[in-house]
């Protein structure tokens, strides 16, 4: 509550700043109140190079059992944060993930978790942009075929989970 009040006071100070300036020209007016500490300064991160923002590395899980990895990848395929990839990757995972070998599962893990931007995965899968060599794997080929939808399957929602 206090944080919201401070933010409201800061914003109202910006709105009424021109009025305060005109009032400050008057001799008998009281001085303006001191500005409150801005809450926006609390969240600003200042890097020396503004064009470079470090992205966290995806943690490699070398000792993760294959079945656990497949369950995690199924979840991550369904919860991408963008509907287009949610539909494409969840239907792809439901169709192919259980039949993947350990190597194919590792390739799929690298594909969906190694890329920092989900739009890249979408553009590569739909062949709008060329796929970089490190992601142009057997799994990406399967995903591209899946996206072409030669079977003309309606994909308006994610497939049900088989629990």
UniProtKB/Swiss-Prot annotation:
It is found in: Mitochondrion matrix. Coiled coil: none annotated. Residues 1-23 form a transit peptide. Pfam families: Sdh5. One of its GO terms (cellular component) is mitochondrial matrix. Plays an essential role in the assembly of succinate dehydrogenase (SDH), an enzyme complex (also referred to as respiratory complex II) that is a component of both the tricarboxylic acid (TCA) cycle and the mitochondrial electron transport chain, and which couples the oxidation of succinate to fumarate with the reduction of ubiquinone (coenzyme Q) to ubiquinol. Required for flavinylation (covalent attachment of FAD) of the flavoprotein subunit of the SDH catalytic dimer. HAMAP family: SDHAF2. This is Succinate dehydrogenase assembly factor 2-A, mitochondrial. It comes from Drosophila melanogaster (Fruit fly).
């Amino acid at each position: 509550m206090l944080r919201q009040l401070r933010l409201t006071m800061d914003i109202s100070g910006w709105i009424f700043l021109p009025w305060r300036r005109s009032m400050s020209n008057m001799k008998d007016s009281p001085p303006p109140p001191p500005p409150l500490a801005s809450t926006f300064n609390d969240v600003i991160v200042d890097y020396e190079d503004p064009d470079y923002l470090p992205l966290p590395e995806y943690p490699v899980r070398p000792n993760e059992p294959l079945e656990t990895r497949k369950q995690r990848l199924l979840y991550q395929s369904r919860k991408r944060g963008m509907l287009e990839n949610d539909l494409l990757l969840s239907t792809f995972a439901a169709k192919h993930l259980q039949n993947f070998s350990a190597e194919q599962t590792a390739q799929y893990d690298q594909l969906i978790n190694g890329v920092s931007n989900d739009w890249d995965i979408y553009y590569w899968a739909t062949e709008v942009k060329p796929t970089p060599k490190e992601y142009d794997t057997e799994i990406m080929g399967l995903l591209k075929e899946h996206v072409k939808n030669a079977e003309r399957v309606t994909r308006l929602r994610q497939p049900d989970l088989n629990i």
